[in-house]
């Protein structure tokens, strides 16, 4: 963003040097990449008057001129210009002047035997124009208002500096001269002098505009105004040309220049369409109702102002008139409807588009313009109609136009947005400022204090905020052109620190410094990962972006590749691929887990963190070459491994068989519950999913909701240490084997055994599962090991015989089974 200091001075009082201001802007967040002294090329150039001209005796093309530059003695200058004559006012380069435009340093010299003490210059030689015919002759009315010897910089209005600012994405207000002026006012604590609106015009809220909802979304707006009796031949006044030129924009004509001027001054892009050309395009008289904003069609094209003919597609948003493309929205206008010398009436467009669609259109066609760069950073729609009004005000100064009607798509929401700002929060975040007493050497006397309410309010008022006093501090109202970056309390605190000066705050950290610590969730998650790793699992990390395969995936608005265009809704598919790749590489087993996020589109967009994993093969031993021994794990072995890994969380996780998970084997899968809440699933992968991956038979998948299991495991009573006396007597074990109906859960059976035993029954474990067709399809054999122990004596068979028999009897009755021999 380039802006001249003279333009800034018309808007804000500047009471410091250009270099000092440049430094303050950079420290304040508006980095000045370069500072150009406009007078650099005309240093040593002064106003002179040609007193006499005589022909050079030794040359037909040279003249000897006596030129008065306000000194006691006039200069003798040999000049070769055809248009030099007596009594004209000229630009004189004195001895020692360097003309950078032609890389020439003026020296006192002798030309064809005649001494020459300077040079009479053309505008080309001064670097003002690209080409010139003869020397520059200064208008007598201008010259008579200045003394001879006046600097050329003053005559050419070049006593100015141009700041080239690097505006960051979080400060879109810096893309306007008024925004930069407000920043300078805040940094220097000086007064603003913004131009007011001379006339306001009637607005018509037309809600029947055909507007693409993606382009004109919330806090967006489209307006179009018909302005008659203008003249495309009229050129811009000098002040307007000068401001555009120093901002790097070429002057075209007054109509185009005013739209560019508002772009620079207010940061609001405008576009002018030639009304007659629009009418010719659609074959009838055009109306504001004909304008629309829509997605382009794949078979359309548009010849634009830069002379390029762009092929359009559905990723480009266009402005249409009677459905015919006339501009690429927010990027560049069409050449066919552009303003030229024959223009007598225009439609003036002012809009705010969704930054995302502007960025997408700009990227697709491969150009970035002054307009698109501002839309991409963000513009407040609350300033748009005022910017349009400001443009029409300037048009009224130069054309005899009738007051137009501004047709707009929506009414402005004048509801104030207030940000609560707490006094105590400011103190906590910023700490005290340090006052250095200049009466003491080496700043040995330092005073520390917190910011006063007056200091806080004054700084926020400097950036246009309005403050309402509250008990806790203030409710702060933000001006529209800062509404893109001042969104939260912390943003306001940052502004206060920036304007006070970061170097003013105490550098010492709070004392004492409390060491950071992990939350209970973080500790539990680390325990969980440790438990899995210790039990042979490897942690993996898969990509959360996947290709589009079904409609229920959440699409990314600006994907880099089609393969990464959507957010994943599961992790298990990637884990199947990881296991398959490992097995193909020669690995005998693959036990993996991952903690990651999945994303759901329905019913509402949601994000869920889960623990997902896969178990394939047995990692306990290697097989002999040529061995036919099966290396696959059974369902219960795999489930036991997961149980062992999760035991570190001290959770009781129950299994309930299910056949409703479509990617799991209907007879070998279960849903997992803890404290009555479903927390995940475990099961063998469905054979249909691995028909082309035969190696992955007997592969098991599991998933757990991280938030649910960590909440259950971190309850306070979970981690209360319970001390037990170390057993001093041996335990006695008995095995029992029954054939059960498969409808009974192992957890139910174990629970019943524990209830049936007395305090001597210490533990119950499932040690064997046997499934055979001879039992019938609905039956299965389970073997349990019961452990008995008395804390005071060694048990005998007679001590537990009756108890063990009682347990067997209860199990037989409860589950309609018989003890196997």
UniProtKB/Swiss-Prot annotation:
What PROSITE patterns does UniProt report for this protein, alphabetically? B5, FDX_ACB, TRBD
- Give the cofactor binding note: Binds 2 magnesium ions per tetramer.
Q: Which SMART domains is this protein grouped with?
A: B3_4 (SM00873), B5 (SM00874), FDX-ACB (SM00896)
Q: Might you name a Gene Ontology BP term for this protein?
A: phenylalanyl-tRNA aminoacylation
- Keywords on record: Aminoacyl-tRNA synthetase, ATP-binding, Cytoplasm, Ligase, Magnesium, Metal-binding, Nucleotide-binding, Protein biosynthesis, RNA-binding, tRNA-binding
Gene Ontology cellular component terms for the protein in this record = phenylalanine-tRNA ligase complex
All residue ranges annotated as the B5 domain in the record: 414-507
- Chief site of localization: cytoplasm
Its UniProt entry gives the catalysed reaction(s) as: tRNA(Phe) + L-phenylalanine + ATP = L-phenylalanyl-tRNA(Phe) + AMP + diphosphate + H(+)
* Enzyme Commission number, as recorded: 6.1.1.20
What are the FDX-ACB domain coordinates in residue numbering?
727-820
Q: Which residues participate in Mg(2+) binding? A: 485, 491, 494-495
Pfam families the UniProt entry points to: B3_4, B5, FDX-ACB, tRNA_bind, tRNA_synthFbeta
Return one GO MF term.
tRNA binding
Q: Where in the cell is it found?
A: Cytoplasm
InterPro entries, sorted? aa-tRNA-synth_II/BPL/LPL, B3/B4_tRNA-bd, DNA-bd_dom_put_sf, Fdx_antiC-bd, Fdx_antiC-bd_sf, NA-bd_OB-fold, Phe-tRNA-ligase_IIc_bsu, Phe-tRNA-ligase_IIc_bsu_bact
Do you know which HAMAP family this protein is assigned to?
A: Phe_tRNA_synth_beta1
Report quaternary structure and partners.
Answer: Tetramer of two alpha and two beta subunits.
Q: What is the protein name stated in its UniProt record?
A: Phenylalanine--tRNA ligase beta subunit
**What organism is listed for this UniProt entry?**
Prochlorococcus marinus subsp. pastoris (strain CCMP1986 / NIES-2087 / MED4)
Could you read off the lineage of the organism from its UniProt record?
Bacteria, Bacillati, Cyanobacteriota, Cyanophyceae, Synechococcales
């Amino acid at each position: 963003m380039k802006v001249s200091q003279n333009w800034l001075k018309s808007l804000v009082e500047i009471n410091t040097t250009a270099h000092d201001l440049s430094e303050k802007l950079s420290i304040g967040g508006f980095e000045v990449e370069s500072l150009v002294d406009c007078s650099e090329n005309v240093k040593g150039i002064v106003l002179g008057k040609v007193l006499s001209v005589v022909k050079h005796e030794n040359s037909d093309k040279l003249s000897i001129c006596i030129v008065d530059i306000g000194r006691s003695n006039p200069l003798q200058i040999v000049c070769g210009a055809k248009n030099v004559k007596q009594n004209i006012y000229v630009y004189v380069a004195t001895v020692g002047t360097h003309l950078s435009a032609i890389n020439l340093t003026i020296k006192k010299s002798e030309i064809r035997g005649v001494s020459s003490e300077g040079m009479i210059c053309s505008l080309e030689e001064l670097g003002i124009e690209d080409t010139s015919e003869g020397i520059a002759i200064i208008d007598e009315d201008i010259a008579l208002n200045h003394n001879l010897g006046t600097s050329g910089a003053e005559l050419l209005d070049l006593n100015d500096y141009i700041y080239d600012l690097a505006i960051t994405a979080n400060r879109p207000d810096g893309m306007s001269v008024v925004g930069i002026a407000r920043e300078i006012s805040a940094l220097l604590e000086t007064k603003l002098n913004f131009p007011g609106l001379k006339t306001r015009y009637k607005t018509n809220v037309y809600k029947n505009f055909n507007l693409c909802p993606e382009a004109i979304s919330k806090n967006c707006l489209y307006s179009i105004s018909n302005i008659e009796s203008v003249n495309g031949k009229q050129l811009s006044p000098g002040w307007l040309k000068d401001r555009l030129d120093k901002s790097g924009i070429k002057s075209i004509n007054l109509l185009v220049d005013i739209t560019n001027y508002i772009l620079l001054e207010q940061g609001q892009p405008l576009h002018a369409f030639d009304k007659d050309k629009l009418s010719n395009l659609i074959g009838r008289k055009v109306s504001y109702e004909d304008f629309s904003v829509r997605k382009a069609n794949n078979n359309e094209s548009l010849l634009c102002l830069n002379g390029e003919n762009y092929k359009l597609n559905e990723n480009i948003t266009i402005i249409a008139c009677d459905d015919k493309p006339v501009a690429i929205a927010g990027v560049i206008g069409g050449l066919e409807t552009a303003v030229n010398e024959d223009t007598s009436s225009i439609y003036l467009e002012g809009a705010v588009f969704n930054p995302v669609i502007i960025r997408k259109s700009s990227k697709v066609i491969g150009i970035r313009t002054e307009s698109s760069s501002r839309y991409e950073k963000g513009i407040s729609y609350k300033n748009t109609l005022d910017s349009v009004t400001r443009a029409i005000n300037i048009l009224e100064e130069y054309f005899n136009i009738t007051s137009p009607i501004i047709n707009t798509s929506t009414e402005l929401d004048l509801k104030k947005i207030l940000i609560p700002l707490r006094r105590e929060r400011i103190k906590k975040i910023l700490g005290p400022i340090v006052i250095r007493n200049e009466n003491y050497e080496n700043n040995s006397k330092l005073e520390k204090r917190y910011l006063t309410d007056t200091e806080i309010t004054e700084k926020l008022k400097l950036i246009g905020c309005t403050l309402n006093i509250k008990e806790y501090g203030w409710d702060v109202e933000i001006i529209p052109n800062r509404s893109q970056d001042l969104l939260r309390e912390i943003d306001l605190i940052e502004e206060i620190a920036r304007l006070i000066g970061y170097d003013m705050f105490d550098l010492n950290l709070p004392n004492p410094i409390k060491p950071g610590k992990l939350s209970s969730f973080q500790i539990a998650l680390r325990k969980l990962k440790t438990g899995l790793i210790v039990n042979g699992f490897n942690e993996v990390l898969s990509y959360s972006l996947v290709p589009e395969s079904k409609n229920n995936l959440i699409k990314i608005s600006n994907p880099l590749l089609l393969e990464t265009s959507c957010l994943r809704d599961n992790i298990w598919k990637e884990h199947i691929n990881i296991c398959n790749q490992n097995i193909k590489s020669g690995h005998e087993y693959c036990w993996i887990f991952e903690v990651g996020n999945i994303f759901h589109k329905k019913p509402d967009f949601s994000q869920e963190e889960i623990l997902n994993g896969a178990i394939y093969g047995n990692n306990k031993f290697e097989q002999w070459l040529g061995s036919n021994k099966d290396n696959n794990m059974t369902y219960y072995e795999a489930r036991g491994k997961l149980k062992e890994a999760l035991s570190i969380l001290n959770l009781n996780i129950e299994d309930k068989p299910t056949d409703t998970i479509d990617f799991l084997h209907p007879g070998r899968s279960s849903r997992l519950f803890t404290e009555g809440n479903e927390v995940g699933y475990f099961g063998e992968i469905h054979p249909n999913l691995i028909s082309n991956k035969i190696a992955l038979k007997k592969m098991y998948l599991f998933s757990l909701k991280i938030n649910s299991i960590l909440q259950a495991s971190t309850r306070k009573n979970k981690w209360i240490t319970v001390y037990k006396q170390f057993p001093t007597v041996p335990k006695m074990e008995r095995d029992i084997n029954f054939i059960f109906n498969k409808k009974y859960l192992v957890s139910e059976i174990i629970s019943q055994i524990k209830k049936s035993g007395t305090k001597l029954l210490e533990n119950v474990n499932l040690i064997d599962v046997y499934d055979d067709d001879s039992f019938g399809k609905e039956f299965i054999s389970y073997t349990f090991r019961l452990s008995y122990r008395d804390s005071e004596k060694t048990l005998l068979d007679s001590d537990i015989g009756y108890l063990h028999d009682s347990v067997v009897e209860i199990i037989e009755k409860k589950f309609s089974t018989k003890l196997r021999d």
